[in-house]
Amino acid sequence: MKLVRDFNDYQILDMDKGMKVEAWHNVILKRPDPQIIWPSLNPYNAKVDAIYNRSNKGGGAWDIKNAKIPATWQVTYHDLTFNLKLMGFKHTGLFPEQAYNWNMLRMKIKAANREVKVLNLFAYTGAASVAALSAGASVVHVDSSRGMID
């Protein structure tokens, strides 16, 4: 996986035995990540705004710790602005590990020196579509996830 070091509105604050603490602009979230199997070297003990708790019946729910957490908020990456919210499946609607791919997509579109048309199938939350549009491409965004297209 390629990393980007300039996603100023996103930061991993801690990782500990299946849990990850992240800062999304000014919102601090703690949520499960099954790939984190190691103990924290520097535990994050400050307050978090919300914690996602898995249910043993499947799925889970957000436990809001800060009553002032906004229902939606924005983060920026370069000149892109994304609207986030707490989603039912432990995420926020944005996947920061994809930022490298957004960079590559934008670079390829800008370097094409021709009209570029992008068909983004299974586009889900749309960050790649936004990145392609920002680079000048014509984009068709297709997804069947009701929460993403409403």
Predicted regions: what is each one?
Residues 107-150:
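Conserved SAM/SAH cofactor-binding pocket of Class I
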Residues 8-22, 29-96, 103:
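Non-catalytic substrate-recognition/targeting regions of SAM-dependent transferases
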Residues 96-103, 107, 150:
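Short, contiguous clusters of charged residues that form electrostatic/catalytic patches at enzyme active sites
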Residues 1-4:
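N-terminal accessory targeting/assembly segments
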